[in-house]
């Protein structure tokens, strides 16, 4: 796909999984992403400290890693303090060479709580498999999402040797659709919170009004008696 003349776009194959991450006496379960050097720019992530791994690191299967901004906190330290330190990832020693800037949760995953390693390192040293889970593609603005998906499907069908009329053995997702859905869900959730807050205020107001009415009613005889006595 990378070398294909029809689609010369920036791509990053990915291998994903969960492994234990240990540093000194602390241990956590963490989401591991094995990817290419282009993954960072495709995702729009930035390095806060240190550097991202290079293509040379990938080809050499180097045991280097980049961590999200919250990983250090989970290990009872700070992510920046881990730069230059060695950690145990699934029984394999890695050197932390960088930390990403905080991105926040996307609803499906949280980049701040992940660890990123070179694709071939992940394949050979961590997961022991050469089958990728997904391929992330950065589509130029000159293409519409529909045009891009048609072109990608055509290339993948050819590479997978899928004949005419045969079903695809892969799935193509337009991430912008998920982004739109997330925005809609966030808007609905915000509206629900505002609605719940409004109901709470209304119920609270009724409660205060009832208390005031009860207080006045209970003191009616007392007030009448005081007036009769000239108070």
What does each of the following model-derived ranges do?
Residues 197, 206-231:
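Intracellular coupling helices
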Residues 28, 131-135, 168:
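Short amphipathic alpha-helical segments
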Residues 7-11, 165, 230:
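Short acidic amphipathic segments
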């Amino acid at each position: 796909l990378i070398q294909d003349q029809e689609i010369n776009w920036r791509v990053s194959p990915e291998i994903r999984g969960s492994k234990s991450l240990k540093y000194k006496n602390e241990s956590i379960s963490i989401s591991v992403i094995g990817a290419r050097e282009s993954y960072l720019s495709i995702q729009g992530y930035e390095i806060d400290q240190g550097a991202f791994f290079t293509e040379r690191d990938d080809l050499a299967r180097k045991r280097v890693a980049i961590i999200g901004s919250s990983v250090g906190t989970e290990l009872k330290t700070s992510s920046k303090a881990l730069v230059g330190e060695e950690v145990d990832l699934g029984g394999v020693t890695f050197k932390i060479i960088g930390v990403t800037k905080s991105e926040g949760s996307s609803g499906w995953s949280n980049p701040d709580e992940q660890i990123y390693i070179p694709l071939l390192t992940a394949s050979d040293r961590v997961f022991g498999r050469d089958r990728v889970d997904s391929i992330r593609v950065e589509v130029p603005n000159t293409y519409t999402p529909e045009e891009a998906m048609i072109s990608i499907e055509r290339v993948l069908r050819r590479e997978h040797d899928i004949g005419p009329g045969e079903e695809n053995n892969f799935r193509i997702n337009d991430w912008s659709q998920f982004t739109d859905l997330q925005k809609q869900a966030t808007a609905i959730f915000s509206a629900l919170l505002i609605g719940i807050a409004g109901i709470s205020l209304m119920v609270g107001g009724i409660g205060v009004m009832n208390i005031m009415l009860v207080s006045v009613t209970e003191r009616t005889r007392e007030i009448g008696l005081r007036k009769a006595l000239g108070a």
